[in-house]
Amino acid sequence: DGQSIYESGTSPTCASCHDRGTAGAPKINEPGDWDGIDLDAEALVDSTMDGKGAMPAYDGRADRDEVKEAVEYMLSTIE
């Protein structure tokens, strides 16, 4: 499920940065951190696959469908 992928998927895991806000990553459970970010799941999956800022590109390292599950989990924590 999305939470498991978020916590223990491809390294570095989503949780390794988004739990603490490392390198400016918006934190889960903190809706204010996501202000100004396009919250469209597909747009966030694209950013994850391509890499953005300090976040490395996951294209070729992670399955797009699993990335989408993790993104949807993250979005569910800020609704």
From Swiss-Prot:
This is Cytochrome c-551. InterPro entries: Cyt_c-like_dom, Cyt_c-like_dom_sf, Cyt_CIE. SUPFAM superfamilies: Cytochrome c. Residues 1-14 have a biased composition (Polar residues). Binds 1 heme c group covalently per subunit. Residues 1-35 are annotated as: Disordered. Keywords: Electron transport, Heme, Iron, Metal-binding, Transport.
